[in-house]
Amino acid sequence: MNRLTIIIAAICCTMLAYAQPPQGFGGPRVEPQYKNVNYAGDELEAHQMDIYLPQGNQERYKVVVAIYGSAWFANNMKGMAYMSIGKPLTDAGFAVVCINHRSSGDARFPAQIHDVKAAIRYLRANADRYRLDTSFIGITGFSSGGHLSALAGVTNGMKSRTVGATTVDLEGAVSGHPDESSRVDAVVDWFGPVDMARMENCETVKDGNSPEAALMGGAPADMPEMVSLISPITYVTKDCPRFLVIHGDADNVVPHCQSAYFAEELEKAGCLEEFITVPGGQHGPVTFNEGTFKRMVDFFLKESAEKAQSPNKKLTLKQADGKYVVEYQGKTVLRIEADGYGLGKTFAQRQELTFVRHLHEDYTMLSGKRLHASNEANEYAVAVDDRTRLVWRLYNDGVAFRYELTGMNGETLPEERTAYLIPEGKNRWVQRWTEPYEAFFPHATTGESRDHRWGYPALIEAQEGVFALLSEADINRRQSASCLRNDGDVERYRVCPDKNDLKMTDNWHSPWRMAIVGTLANVVESTLVTDLSEPCRLTDTSWIEPGVVSWIYWAHNHGSNDYNIIRQYVDMAVEMKLPYVLIDAEWDGMKDGKTIEDAISYAKSRGVKPMIWYNSSVGWINGAPGPKFRLNKPEDREREFAWCEKLGVAGVKIDFFSGDNQMNMDYYIDLMESTARHHLLVNFHGATIPRGWQRTYPHMLTMEAVYGAEWYNNVPTFTNRAASHNTTLPFTRNVIGPMDYTPCAFSDSQHPHITTHAHELALTVLFESGLQHLADRPESFLAQPQEVKDFLGQLPTVWDETRYVSGYPGRSAVIARRSGNTWYVAGINGMDEEQVLDADLRAIIPTFRTARLFLDGKKWEIRTATKLPTTVKCRPRGGFVYVVER
């Protein structure tokens, strides 16, 4: 305990002796306007704060929270935070909020970060009372206060974190404001301990007599998982706010290397403003000086400056030359024309963007790339004319905008005046428009084409390593979906909604036009499409069960009218433990005296849930397979789906739609609402792309809208282009929603495949779909090694999280998805020559118990591993899968 006493004495004496800013730096000392405010609604001194306002009569002040250092041993030193680092900030015009928090003697970690986040939530909830502008909340602290400030920043939006068998609740339940956000917008870390695993001589944990041991409640060497969870460096991601890190190189309490390690990780994530090393700076003395205080103030002034920006401030929006310019970390990504519909009177001068609100909404999906998602954005608005309001949302991973019209009086919408300006020479992967969205995403550097019509999504590499994925979201009734056209000007991609002759009355808004912006990791991991879409409209979702499907059509185009073939696929589902079988087209003409009722009865008797196919009867009708004309009229649709429900049908596949006009969008919604009433899962085939319905109607588990494995039945070109095409889909089509590619072809259809077995297996993980239809025939699947059959029988189609590992469109793709405590990692080579793929998972899976590797061999190489290789040598058009148990 002597060592702890020495540390505390050193910190306190140092702060008191040297913390007061130099005379003349600012004006006279400011007393707190609000003293001993309790932010938790209890009587604890540890839950008090002082609020200092600048001198003056400004209506509101932007906020900086300041936290004292005490090796986490003190619960009542909020005044020291102001004495040390607060005054320069009030002099600069900030409201400074100095908070107490529970000490390590009061409670173990994570109680201290719970207190910090509770204080921030309290400030947002009571901003009016204290004249605070909480559109900006910065945070700063020194020593242990630097640790808590850094931790508050790097855990923005995180509810909890698990390392190994240990889970930490990061938000806590202190205070009565659970609906408020605890995010911070910028961080200044003064010599805080940030990597508890390297506190002793920059290499190892300190002994059990250290302050961090008291904070954790045990010797760090005995608690490696908690050491990781208590360390801010563990949480650094691309979504962190901007950081300024300051540390003296003569600090004998917290080693300078702590901040060096931290700054390195922040730099990699693109979150570091600057790392300042103060020559001769100690744990306070010399490090605190007029120059470093000014750097802190300038940083907070810069970060709080009025501008349209994302919550993490990496993405900004400004107006220039009549366009809206989207920038990512200072680099121009998109220039957008957004001029409405020309319905109202325009203004003499272009109107300015104004801040509307900060939006923060957590929600849960039933399928998709991430179960728990957060819809967090800053919303701005601008008047286009006297009847049209343009609403912008700036997210950490993208932008979205829509038009809101008022006073519609029986008018039809004129042409929309929206365009994306994409210079020639930029890398792009865009499919030519087709009605069912079934085309390749070829690499190009030009917008030239035969008909200059393009389908969503469209991926653009705007700057080296910085991408924009264009699409749209939240299609509702009275709306059409759109495509892109660049006829007339090859660099100007106009947004062109499909035909909409509906006469509008009252108020109306467009769908969200959206762009995911950032690195390829931002693109792959984004949930922007569902963030923008309406919440789930179903009151009961307990019947919705995603899963893997035994599918007849790929090997037997007319097999669903053959009862014996259906039995084979049901039996395969039983053998491989697949929950579903899909009986495809032509079941209404069953041969051999059997009926669809017989097939459904057989599937149910074997414990397999049947799904059946329908023709939508709005697209291909003449000469098309049936059943047809059973869903178009409301009364027919209800009768048919009631019959399905009575028979025990689990879901329906509805095929052959026609276009994206308002009538068809309404038809999709009619189908989803009717199937929900009868507890039927939905797969839309020959259809439009996902635009967020997977959130609003979560029983809609997949959509085709992809040039998938079905095309091995149709054209020889798919054989040679499939591998490269497959590596574009994780960065384009599958980003926006579930994709019914129908993967896993080990044998051949009408045209052969030349991808390897491991490549095909990897597609089942690489491609996300709530219903994953397996393409191949029973004899092919049943001939595979038992490990492969077990893998497919246990394959999740619901993912807790998805992480980009490596890859580039057309070359390779490596993605990791987690289901519970199991990570599935899949990679494919899209090239015709051998490649070494980056599969470094150390940051994603730092520890694990067991791993099974599926690699390319003569057909297979399957083995267990105690260590995961960081690279994989992949055969031409090859692949791999890891199944890693934590």
Give the residues covered by each predicted segment:
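N-terminal cap/lid segment of alpha/beta-hydrolase-fold proteins
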Residues: Q20-E59
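Mobile cap/lid helix-loop segments that gate and shape the active-site cleft of serine hydrolases
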Residues: Q23-E31, D42, R161-V174, R198-Y235
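N-terminal accessory beta-strand-rich subdomains and adjacent acidic, glycine-rich linkers
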Residues: P311-V529
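Aromatic- and carboxylate-enriched substrate-binding clefts and catalytic-loop regions
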Residues: E586-T756
